[in-house]
């Protein structure tokens, strides 16, 4: 069965893993998923990730992060979906929780957080919001 929204699947695996208090979760690998995980790691929402071989396919093992027993990610949501894409210019990028969270944006310069995109003055597709 084909997956219609691989990024939505990744975010759901992270959300479910943290709700179940898992140390790590597995996800199929792709370049977009790895770039999104790079942003989450840079911003301190996950401890890290590594590529693994999963029965002949490459996968990603995502090390989840907790702070005083609570998940580092309180909320994660997909913004731009396969049926409705959402684009934003650098000056119009949404702020999550008044700047306490991040928006993940796919730009011509790669997948960036909203702060990085504003700093580089680039807009793009708003992929997800995290806090």
UniProtKB/Swiss-Prot annotation:
Keyword Repeat assigned: no
One Gene Ontology cellular component: ribosome
Residue stretches in coiled coil: none
A GO BP annotation: translation
GO molecular function terms attached to this record: rRNA binding; structural constituent of ribosome
Keyword field contains Iron: no
InterPro entries: Ribosomal_uS8, Ribosomal_uS8_CS, Ribosomal_uS8_sf
SUPFAM superfamilies: Ribosomal protein S8
Keywords: Ribonucleoprotein, Ribosomal protein, RNA-binding, rRNA-binding
Subunit: Part of the 30S ribosomal subunit. Contacts proteins S5 and S12.
PANTHER family in the record: 40S RIBOSOMAL PROTEIN S15A
Functional description taken from the UniProt entry: One of the primary rRNA binding proteins, it binds directly to 16S rRNA central domain where it helps coordinate assembly of the platform of the 30S subunit.
Family, as annotated: Belongs to the universal ribosomal protein uS8 family.
HAMAP family assigned: Ribosomal_uS8_B (MF_01302_B)
The protein's name in its UniProt record: Small ribosomal subunit protein uS8
């Amino acid at each position: 069965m084909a997956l219609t929204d691989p990024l939505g699947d990744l975010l759901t695996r992270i959300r479910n893993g943290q709700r179940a208090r898992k140390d790590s979760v597995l996800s199929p690998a792709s370049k977009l998923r790895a770039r999104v995980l790079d942003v989450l790691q840079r911003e301190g929402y996950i401890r890290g990730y590594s590529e693994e071989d999963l029965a002949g396919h490459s996968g990603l093992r995502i090390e989840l992060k907790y702070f005083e027993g609570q998940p580092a990610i309180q909320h994660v949501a997909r913004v731009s979906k396969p049926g409705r894409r959402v684009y934003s210019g650098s000056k119009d990028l949404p702020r999550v929780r008044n700047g306490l969270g991040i928006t993940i944006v796919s730009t011509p310069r790669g997948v960036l957080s909203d702060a990085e995109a504003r700093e580089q003055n680039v807009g793009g597709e708003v992929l997800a919001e995290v806090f």
